[in-house]
């Protein structure tokens, strides 16, 4: 609440696209060609640590699956090589994204959101979208598969920030401020539920509503609609038999350990076997065809088994540092009247925070099973590329903030 009121106070004074003469002058001078060593070291090292740990653990958790599958050609390095390739593509895309100023990202935001919606429509077309395990979430692009919902998380963070800046005078109005954005999110949610991808819908809703809240939307309106959203999500769960089964399996996984509670029970076994320092890297038993999706949704359970409580605590600490730096960076950008930049940074922080919290909660048995990967770490090309793009934008915000501080002080 204090965060929101603070940012609302800043937003009430000036808008991003207006700016000051000083910020415009500095903007003309800013080129990402030098001073890169000034970038936030905590942001860089926490993100690098998560990406590297993820690469190692994806390999460790996927060896048995790769060796036992004809799809992979029985090659033990299959998922490692693909994950490394996705990382290389993501880093390359991130380097390109870093070259764009935040003013350019603001101009692109509505178009990126529109492209994301179009991709979500295309993936639902029979014969176009690829179906895996009953979910039609992927667009086949030759040897690769694109998952539009992963890119949409980034696009929503950008669009929500741009929308908030443009609609700043109307943020206190339900009809003019909140309703148009809510309609867009409901459209996205309708398309995501058609795949179905309930988890992505939850994360995207959290990003959009969180950015609106930090941007100064009427608190009473926000509280009322947050309650409506929670009730709506509960109804969606209750009206869907397979989602309802997940709730029952979550409440007592051991009652049906070979059915509804299978994934959760084996995740808990992995956590129990790991104890304080784990059974050793590569020595997991649960990844040997006991724990489904060991290299994606349940990667943290394998980390817990092989590296123990110490490994899990390290991962949590790295995420906490990264998310904290994103939120602090957003606040600093707002203080310098870079409101779009600040909201984007905080939106990315919310995205990584909400998704990692849900994934960790599922792995630890604190939340019902949900098809969400661990950001920056789990196997998945679209997710890794989207995460790298988000990190590049965070670094761009950080770089521009540092340049503005230096320019204003000159």
From Swiss-Prot:
Pfam families registered for this protein in UniProt: FTSW_RODA_SPOVE
Keyword Transmembrane helix: yes
Catalytic activity: [GlcNAc-(1->4)-Mur2Ac(oyl-L-Ala-gamma-D-Glu-L-Lys-D-Ala-D-Ala)](n)-di-trans,octa-cis-undecaprenyl diphosphate + beta-D-GlcNAc-(1->4)-Mur2Ac(oyl-L-Ala-gamma-D-Glu-L-Lys-D-Ala-D-Ala)-di-trans,octa-cis-undecaprenyl diphosphate = [GlcNAc-(1->4)-Mur2Ac(oyl-L-Ala-gamma-D-Glu-L-Lys-D-Ala-D-Ala)](n+1)-di-trans,octa-cis-undecaprenyl diphosphate + di-trans,octa-cis-undecaprenyl diphosphate + H(+)
Domain of life assignment: Bacteria
Membrane topology: Multi-pass membrane protein
Transmembrane segments: 39-59, 78-98, 108-128, 177-197, 198-218, 221-241, 303-323, 342-362, 374-394
Pathway note: Cell wall biogenesis; peptidoglycan biosynthesis
GO function terms (MF aspect): lipid-linked peptidoglycan transporter activity; peptidoglycan glycosyltransferase activity
Enzyme class: transferase
EC number: 2.4.99.28
Subcellular compartments: Cell inner membrane
Primary location recorded for the protein, binned into one broad class: membrane
UniProt xrefs under InterPro entries: FtsW, FtsW/RodA
CC terms in the record's Gene Ontology section: cell division site; plasma membrane
Keyword set, alphabetical order: Cell cycle, Cell division, Cell inner membrane, Cell membrane, Cell shape, Cell wall biogenesis/degradation, Glycosyltransferase, Membrane, Peptidoglycan synthesis, Transferase, Transmembrane, Transmembrane helix
PANTHER family according to UniProt: CELL CYCLE PROTEIN (PTHR30474), PEPTIDOGLYCAN GLYCOSYLTRANSFERASE FTSW-RELATED (PTHR30474:SF2)
Described purpose of this protein according to its UniProt entry: Peptidoglycan polymerase that is essential for cell division.
Family, as annotated: Belongs to the SEDS family. FtsW subfamily.
Protein name: Probable peptidoglycan glycosyltransferase FtsW
Organism, as annotated: Aromatoleum aromaticum (strain DSM 19018 / LMG 30748 / EbN1)
Gene designation: ftsW
